[in-house]
């Protein structure tokens, strides 16, 4: 049923898991003995973060934030709103934001700057997908699984109007679905 709205599959579940394992190995190496705090940016980060955690072989803690700059549409409103903040004190902590996709970059730039202000020891960004063509602010992720074209993609946590997050793969949504 959902597949009928997908123009093409970009990455299969198996391909995503392979990249996530590679990233987990890199984070294990980079954070050995440091107990970093992984902060998932809800809701889209859930499948990626759940898969990634299985492949990090060092102590970690997790927390979550609900942050929005889209408010249900396909384009960023430009205004970042924190709907749920972390519960963990991040002062002197190594923080890794876990995100499904970086598009405009507004949300993660805002969060990175805020956590630096709150005196985190370090702030890094790990994203499943990076869409550099969509960037409107100067920010880059420290860890990127895939760079993607400037197309509207869904699946593996990525949504359109809260739908399609449950697809096990990532695909391009047909334009007629979101241009109605």
Curated annotation (Swiss-Prot):
Its cofactor is Mg(2+). Its main location: cytoplasm. GMP binds at residues 131, 152-153, 159. GO terms for biological process: GMP salvage; guanine salvage; hypoxanthine metabolic process; IMP salvage; purine ribonucleoside salvage. Pathway: Purine metabolism; IMP biosynthesis via salvage pathway; IMP from hypoxanthine: step 1/1; Purine metabolism; GMP biosynthesis via salvage pathway; GMP from guanine: step 1/1. Diphosphate binds at residues 43-44, 165. It is found in: Cytoplasm. It catalyses: IMP + diphosphate = hypoxanthine + 5-phospho-alpha-D-ribose 1-diphosphate; GMP + diphosphate = guanine + 5-phospho-alpha-D-ribose 1-diphosphate. GO terms for cellular component: cytosol. The active site is at residue 103. One of its GO terms (molecular function) is magnesium ion binding. Its EC number is 2.4.2.8. Keywords: Cytoplasm, Glycosyltransferase, Magnesium, Metal-binding, Nucleotide-binding, Purine salvage, Transferase. Mg(2+) binds at residues 99-100. It comes from the Bacteria. PANTHER family: HYPOXANTHINE PHOSPHORIBOSYLTRANSFERASE, HYPOXANTHINE-GUANINE PHOSPHORIBOSYLTRANSFERASE. Belongs to the purine/pyrimidine phosphoribosyltransferase family. Purine salvage pathway enzyme that catalyzes the transfer of the ribosyl-5-phosphate group from 5-phospho-alpha-D-ribose 1-diphosphate (PRPP) to the N9 position of the 6-oxopurines hypoxanthine and guanine to form the corresponding ribonucleotides IMP (inosine 5'-monophosphate) and GMP (guanosine 5'-monophosphate), with the release of PPi. This is Hypoxanthine-guanine phosphoribosyltransferase.
């Amino acid at each position: 049923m959902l597949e009928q709205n997908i123009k093409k599959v970009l990455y299969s579940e198996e391909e995503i898991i392979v990249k996530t394992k590679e990233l987990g190995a890199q984070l294990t190496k980079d954070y050995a003995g440091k107990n970093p705090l992984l902060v998932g940016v809800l809701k889209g980060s859930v499948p990626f973060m759940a898969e990634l955690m299985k492949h990090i072989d060092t102590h970690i803690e997790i927390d979550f934030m609900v942050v929005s700059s889209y408010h249900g549409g396909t384009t960023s409103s430009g205004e970042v709103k924190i709907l749920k903040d972390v519960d963990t004190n991040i002062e002197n902590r190594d923080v890794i934001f876990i995100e499904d996709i970086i598009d405009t970059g507004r949300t993660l730039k805002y969060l990175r700057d805020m956590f630096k202000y709150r005196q985190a020891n370090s702030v890094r960004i790990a994203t499943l997908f990076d869409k550099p063509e969509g960037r409107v602010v100067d920010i880059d992720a420290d860890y990127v699984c895939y760079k993607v074209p400037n197309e509207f993609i869904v699946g593996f946590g990525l949504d359109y109007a809260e739908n399609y997050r449950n697809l096990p793969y990532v695909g391009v949504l047909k334009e007629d679905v979101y241009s109605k």
